[in-house]
């Protein structure tokens, strides 16, 4: 029986794209900072001159899937991370955006075979979003770690095939 696991120490040669929603950038900017900190601490070059990492900004979480799809289809990246924050309001807009963003991001991963980390916060209040982006913890760090694990796992699976 073979057992496959991703490792967090296998960042060399890994190309990562991060797609960030600009809407609620008070939150998404903090998620990005946490994500980049994690990647840097695990050996990914996150400098502006990096050939390992690219960051793409989109208007909002609804637009995350189309940008992620374009990047995944380019063949340049082994893993993508999507970062967004959708905060419930008084209208059904929240439900539409969350549903389409999550379905779209999942479809990109399925259709391209490139892992896409779902880093979209869905909260009832801005306070809850800020707590998840740095006040209590920064989920951006977790999303970076998930990307490293999935990139490493995919490499292990491809090597075995």
From Swiss-Prot:
Give an example GO biological process: riboflavin biosynthetic process
Question: NCBIfam families given for it?
Answer: lumazine-synth (TIGR00114)
Kindly give the PANTHER family that the UniProt entry links to this protein.
6,7-DIMETHYL-8-RIBITYLLUMAZINE SYNTHASE, 6,7-DIMETHYL-8-RIBITYLLUMAZINE SYNTHASE DMRL SYNTHASE LUMAZINE SYNTHASE
Do you know which SUPFAM superfamilies this protein is assigned to?
Lumazine synthase
Give the similarity note.
Answer: Belongs to the DMRL synthase family.
Q: At which positions is 5-amino-6-(D-ribitylamino)uracil bound?
A: 23, 61-63, 85-87, 118
* UniProt EC number: 2.5.1.78
| UniProt source species | Synechococcus sp. (strain WH7803)
Instruction: List the Pfam families.
Output: DMRL_synthase
Protein name as annotated: 6,7-dimethyl-8-ribityllumazine synthase
What general EC class does the enzyme of this chain belong to?
transferase
For this protein, what reaction is catalysed?
A: (2S)-2-hydroxy-3-oxobutyl phosphate + 5-amino-6-(D-ribitylamino)uracil = 6,7-dimethyl-8-(1-D-ribityl)lumazine + phosphate + 2 H2O + H(+)
The active site is formed by 93 (proton donor)
Annotated (2S)-2-hydroxy-3-oxobutyl phosphate binding sites:
90-91, 132
Which function does this protein serve?
Answer: Catalyzes the formation of 6,7-dimethyl-8-ribityllumazine by condensation of 5-amino-6-(D-ribitylamino)uracil with 3,4-dihydroxy-2-butanone 4-phosphate. This is the penultimate step in the biosynthesis of riboflavin.
For this protein, what is any one GO molecular function term? 6,7-dimethyl-8-ribityllumazine synthase activity
Question: Which HAMAP family does the entry mention?
Answer: Lumazine_synth
Name the UniProt key words of this record, in alphabetical order: Riboflavin biosynthesis, Transferase
Q: Name one GO cellular component term.
A: riboflavin synthase complex
Q: In which pathway does it act?
A: Cofactor biosynthesis; riboflavin biosynthesis; riboflavin from 2-hydroxy-3-oxobutyl phosphate and 5-amino-6-(D-ribitylamino)uracil: step 1/2
């Amino acid at each position: 029986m073979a057992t496959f696991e991703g490792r967090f120490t296998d960042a060399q040669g890994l190309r990562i794209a991060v797609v960030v929603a600009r809407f609620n950038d008070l939150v998404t900017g903090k998620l990005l900072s946490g994500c980049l900190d994690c990647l840097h601490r695990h050996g990914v070059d996150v400098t502006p001159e990096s050939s390992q990492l690219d960051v793409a900004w989109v208007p909002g979480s609804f637009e995350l899937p189309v940008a992620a799809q374009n990047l995944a289809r380019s063949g340049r990246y082994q893993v993508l991370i999507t970062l967004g924050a959708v905060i419930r309001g008084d209208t059904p807009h929240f439900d539409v955006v969350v549903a389409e963003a999550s379905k779209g991001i999942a479809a990109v991963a399925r259709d391209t075979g490139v892992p896409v980390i779902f880093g979209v916060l869905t909260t009832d209040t801005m306070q809850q979003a800020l707590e998840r982006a740095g006040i209590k913890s920064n989920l951006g760090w977790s999303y970076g770690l998930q990307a490293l694990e999935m990139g490493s796992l995919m490499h292990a699976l491809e090597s075995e095939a």
